[in-house]
């Protein structure tokens, strides 16, 4: 085509599953450039998208097409020529709305272009149709007569306005035998011509059917060649689009590399956190082991403390018994001392008396 794209955007491309007519089949692994083109040679608008060198969308916009938004970021349209339904997934609702606006705009432009083309065809074909109509009226007239003058009159009424003249001239013809024989011969000639025309018409009808079949085959082959030519033209005409697409891919790759770098830094940070967590886990395990050892040591000390408490209690009991014994001995000694004191006093008194 050679034209530059009128409008371009990026989207994920899908086609309806030809078997189920329900599921979407992706035709691109990633988002690709989808462009509107104007084909000035054929006066049509096209939607074209390439995935590398392969044309995954080559749709001619017609007035009866409709672009339908099925969600906030997805839209679709049916292409009867390609016998499929295309679907586009956009990155945002804004891109979807912009594409839908352009679709409606170019659809209206296609309708106006079609109307202008039809008007031109009607203007150019009207004189030839009139001349062809005039040529066909004469052979069809004998077929409509079917052998009688009464049946020829309505046919003449359709093709010419001076209707009363045959009726006025028919009166003198009925009174003239010579003229009657002339008309009989003319009628026989017309019947023969009618039979020949009928046979020719049947043969022409058969030929027309054959020609229609051949024409359909030629049209199908022409459409296939046209699609192939369009694909080749797309490959050659979209060099700039491919360059733009390459630039966009490089930019996307750069963005992905930056994103990858950020992700790698985040992964390093997470690794560091994991190492720290492992160190904390090791410290926790070490402290847990030490705590268990301390608990075991504590149990041992508790056992020793219990033993010492028992021994202390036993010692205290022994000391208490010893004290009680000493107290008893002291009481006995006190009694003995008291008795000795009394004995001394008594002895002293006895000495004094003697």
Swiss-Prot record:
Tetramer; this tetrameric structure is critical for forming the high-order complex with SHANK1, which in turn is necessary for the structural and functional integrity of dendritic spines. Interacts with GRM1, GRM5, ITPR1, DNM3, RYR1, RYR2 and SHANK3. Interacts with IFT57 and OPHN1. Encodes a coiled-coil structure that mediates homo- and heteromultimerization. Interacts with SHANK1; forms high-order polymerized complex with a mesh-like network structure, at least composed of SHANK1, HOMER1 and DLGAP1; the complex formation is SHANK1 multimerization dependent. Interacts with NFATC4. Postsynaptic density scaffolding protein. Binds and cross-links cytoplasmic regions of GRM1, GRM5, ITPR1, DNM3, RYR1, RYR2, SHANK1 and SHANK3. By physically linking GRM1 and GRM5 with ER-associated ITPR1 receptors, it aids the coupling of surface receptors to intracellular calcium release. May also couple GRM1 to PI3 kinase through its interaction with AGAP2. Forms a high-order complex with SHANK1, which in turn is necessary for the structural and functional integrity of dendritic spines. Negatively regulates T cell activation by inhibiting the calcineurin-NFAT pathway. Residues 138-147, 155-172 have a biased composition (Polar residues). One of its GO terms (biological process) is regulation of synaptic transmission, glutamatergic. GO terms for molecular function: G protein-coupled glutamate receptor binding. InterPro entries: Homer (IPR045027), Homer_EVH1 (IPR044100), PH-like_dom_sf (IPR011993), WH1/EVH1_dom (IPR000697). GO terms for cellular component: cytoplasm; dendrite; dendritic spine; neuron spine; plasma membrane; postsynaptic density. The lineage of its organism: Eukaryota, Metazoa, Chordata, Craniata, Vertebrata. The modification Phosphoserine is found at residue 306. CDD domains: EVH1_Homer_Vesl. It is found in: Cytoplasm; Postsynaptic density; Synapse; Cell projection, Dendritic spine. Residues 181-352 form a coiled coil. SMART domains: WH1. Residues 1-110 form the WH1 domain. Gene3D superfamilies: 1.20.5.1700, Pleckstrin-homology domain (PH domain)/Phosphotyrosine-binding domain (PTB). Pfam families: WH1 (PF00568). Keywords: Acetylation, Cell projection, Coiled coil, Cytoplasm, Phosphoprotein, Synapse. Residues 114-172 are annotated as: Disordered. It comes from Bos taurus. This is Homer protein homolog 1. Belongs to the Homer family. The modification N-acetylglycine is found at residue 2. The gene is HOMER1. The WH1 domain interacts with the PPXXF motif in GRM1, GRM5, RYR1, RYR2, ITPR1, SHANK 1 and SHANK3. The coiled-Coil domain forms an antiparallel tetrameric arrangement.
